[in-house]
Amino acid sequence: MKYRKFIILVLSILIILPVSTLDGHHIANADDDSPKKLKYKENSALALNYHRVRKANFLNNFIYFFSSSKEIKNYSVSQSQFESQIKWLKSHDAKFLTLKEFLYYKKKGKFPKRSVWINFDDMDETIYENAYPILKKYKIPATGFIITGHVGEENFHNLDMISKKELKEMYKTGLWEFETHTHDLHNLSKNNKSKLMKASEATIIKDLNKSEKYLTKNFKKSQKTIAYPYGLMNDDKLPVIKKAGLKYGFSLEEKAVTPNSNDYYIPRILISDDAFEHLIKRWDGFHEKD
């Protein structure tokens, strides 16, 4: 009887998950399921972006294997996959950068070889529970882009968000920096239009100022950066971002970062297990001689 109930539960989850994620999060940039090899340029860095780090248990692995949900396939890695990726980067002499260092080298015009900047969007509980311990173990710096108006919220687009207490614990390690992912403009409309892209100038400026104030008060935020919800931004809205006082913006795109990358369209590579295998491991920057 217990086995039968378990199967029914799993099947129900598999039916519900592809539907529920359509309303909530990251369908906008999950169209390409076949990562291609990254073009390599000397003097470049990799910005590796994560969203979910799943617990590697039987149920999660079962759901991952059988689900057709792009939210699960493209926007998450398991805890074991994440640790394997970190260990692979370390074994290939990656130079792990803080956000401050990353921006410094970009502005200076010269990245150290094999530069890697680890960052996370949304900051839900899976990051605290499954990624944070690994980064702490290996002493790897990271940046979290926080939806500041939903810190500690349960069931935000089917996600439980990290609490302020947990964020402060992470910050005190000296390994974490926190930046804005908006205060309350992270949503998709029914036609997959970003709430940020639809908002008025006054609404955007008010929202970003509120987010900046929260981050400055709690985490001494100083880098003036934003990770755009869903990685989406266009030239029509960009003047508003600048008017709000932000100096750098991060998108989602399968490209390495160079000093010449536009400061408001800095590409980050969305990491799944497939993306790491096909893009990161094959990047020529890890295979060139010093």
Swiss-Prot record:
UniProt entry keywords in alphabetical sequence: Cell wall, Hydrolase, Secreted, Signal
EC class of the enzyme, as a word: hydrolase
Pfam families reported for this sequence: Polysacc_deac_1
BP GO terms, sorted: carbohydrate metabolic process
An annotated Gene Ontology molecular function: hydrolase activity
Protein family per UniProt: Belongs to the polysaccharide deacetylase family.
Function: Catalyzes the N-deacetylation of poly-beta-1,6-N-acetyl-D-glucosamine (PNAG, also referred to as PIA), a biofilm adhesin polysaccharide. N-deacetylation is crucial for attachment of the polysaccharide to the bacterial cell surface; it leads to the introduction of positive charges in the otherwise neutral PIA polymer, allowing electrostatic interactions.
Name of the molecule in the record: Poly-beta-1,6-N-acetyl-D-glucosamine N-deacetylase
Name of the gene this protein is made from: icaB
